[in-house]
Regions:
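Beta-strand/loop substructures that line and gate deep hydrophobic ligand-binding cavities in soluble
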Residues: 109-157
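Glycine-rich portal/gate segments that line the openings of hydrophobic small-molecule binding cavities
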Residues: 61-109
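Amphipathic hydrophobic-ligand
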Residues: 52-54, 87-95, 114-122
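A conserved amphipathic terminal alpha-helix motif
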Residues: 95-97, 102, 144, 148-181
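Hydrophobic/aromatic beta-strand elements that line small-molecule binding cavities or substrate pockets
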Residues: 27-29, 58-62, 93-100, 110, ...
Length: 181
C-alpha cells in the first residue's frame, strides 16, 4: 500500500474487551487533512450521503436543525446469521446522533433497535505536523449478547468495517472536493 493510499490507515488493530456485557473498542487513524477540514466534512450531509452509498441502504433521513448536531436515520439490509433470524429481520434500523462538541471532539450515539444494541463513540482530533490524528473510542452495549452472538457479529462486520470504510470515503471525498475547488 502506497503512502498516498495509506493516509487514513489504522495505526494499531482495534482492542476488544468484553466487560459488563459491553465491548470496548479503540482505534486510531491518521489523515493528511487538517482537523478543520475533517470536521467540516463530517458535518456535511453530502459526505454522509456518500458514505451511505457503500452500505446496503434502503432509506436515509437527515435532521440538522439543532446547532452542532446531526441526526441520521438509516435502514440497511444486513446479512443475518441463521441462528439470529428468529429474533431479527431486515431491514436493520440505524439511528445516529452526531454531536460536534468542540474542534477536537465529536460524540456519536448509534442505536440499533432491531438488535437492542447501542454504540457510544467519541472521536478525538489532534493536529500533527503532516495532518491530523483521529482516535475513536467506542462502547458497544447489547441486551441480546446472552441470547445470540449476532450482536457481536454485527459489530464485527458493521461497526469495525464501517469505521475503516468511512475514513477511506472521507479521504476520497476530501480529495474530490479539493480538486473541484
Amino acid at each position: 500500500m502506497s503512502a498516498k493510499n495509506a493516509a487514513m490507515s489504522p495505526t494499531y488493530p482495534m482492542v476488544w474487551q468484553n466487560k459488563d456485557m459491553a465491548l470496548n473498542l479503540k482505534d486510531t487513524f491518521h489523515s493528511e487533512y487538517s482537523v478543520i477540514k475533517l470536521l467540516a466534512a463530517l458535518k456535511d450531509i453530502e459526505f454522509h450521503k456518500k458514505r451511505a452509498e457503500s452500505k446496503s441502504l434502503k432509506k436515509i433521513e437527515f435532521n440538522d436543525t439543532k446547532a452542532n448536531t446531526l441526526d441520521i436515520s438509516r435502514q440497511i439490509d444486513f446479512e443475518i446469521p441463521a441462528a439470529a433470524q428468529k429474533m431479527v429481520s431486515n431491514p436493520i434500523s440505524l439511528n445516529e446522533n452526531w454531536i460536534f462538541r468542540s474542534q477536537d471532539l465529536i460524540e456519536i450515539q448509534l442505536s440499533i433497535p432491531n438488535i437492542q444494541t447501542s454504540i457510544s463513540a467519541q472521536m478525538y482530533f489532534e493536529t500533527e505536523n503532516l495532518g491530523s490524528l483521529i482516535r475513536v473510542e467506542s462502547i458497544v452495549q447489547s441486551k441480546i449478547f446472552l441470547m445470540s452472538s449476532f450482536a457481536e457479529e454485527f459489530v464485527s462486520k458493521y461497526w469495525k468495517k464501517a469505521l475503516l470504510e468511512d475514513f477511506e470515503i472521507l479521504n476520497q471525498w476530501l480529495k474530490s472536493i479539493q480538486i473541484s475547488d
